[in-house]
Amino acid sequence: MKSIQSNIKKAKKYLDNNHCVAVPTETVYGLAANAYSNSAVKKIFSLKKRPLNNPLIVHYYDIQRLKEDCDINDNLVKLYKKFSPGPITYVLKLKNNSKISKFVTNNKKSIAVRFPKHKLLRNLLKNLDYPVAAPSANISSRLSSVKPSDVKEEFGSKIKYILNGGKSKIGVESTILNLLEKPSLLRYGGLDTKKIENVLKKKLLINTNSKKKLSSGLFPLHYSPGIPLRVNVKKPKKDEAYFCLLYTSPSPRDLSTSRMPSSA
């Protein structure tokens, strides 16, 4: 217990001094920084080599702290009571007097927020005076990190500290909902959309506006393997391996499609 508290204090010290810290979540590891600090948030973009027009998800301890920065609506309250903390992100209206860094939202009047379930991160958030912006801890468009060694492989000594919380249980990012108007799905993720619809008692609209980037994970290039990929291969060459995608969704509406690049 003492070592856990010591690690949390160490992570807090780095965050308080506007450094980036890798943190565990139930979905994937995040690269965290003080969401109220422009200089800290800019370090996230620099380390990840991430475009500045790609908004970040901000992690809060609870809905009471969220009220300082966002307008709370009925749909959020319903979903929060059922699924948060957990692998779901909400896009909400940002208050005019919010202290959230403009780099988090790309100067938009909306923000993507979530309440992580991992006990270690929740303990850290409870002890901070600010929420943290925390996109996945990987170079932009590369595969997400699900354990400390993945983070170390991606960034080496470029980040100050990795808060070791073991392997992420879910392994894929959070489901993202737009709650600015009628609830709509922006990204499939760690929470089944059917469960969300059961709580809302309505079908989710599917986001079709690819130009309006309200949250992270909405760019055409998101997951890119670091080695060449060949498709429709009958026999692998030496040092190659098969990569198989299994479709287990109960409904075709849960499929996202994209044209493969010519280099694949």
List each language-model region with its residue ranges:
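Positively charged, low-complexity/disordered segments
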Residues: 252-254, 258-264
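Active-site-adjacent structural elements in enzyme catalytic cores
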Residues: 1-249, 253
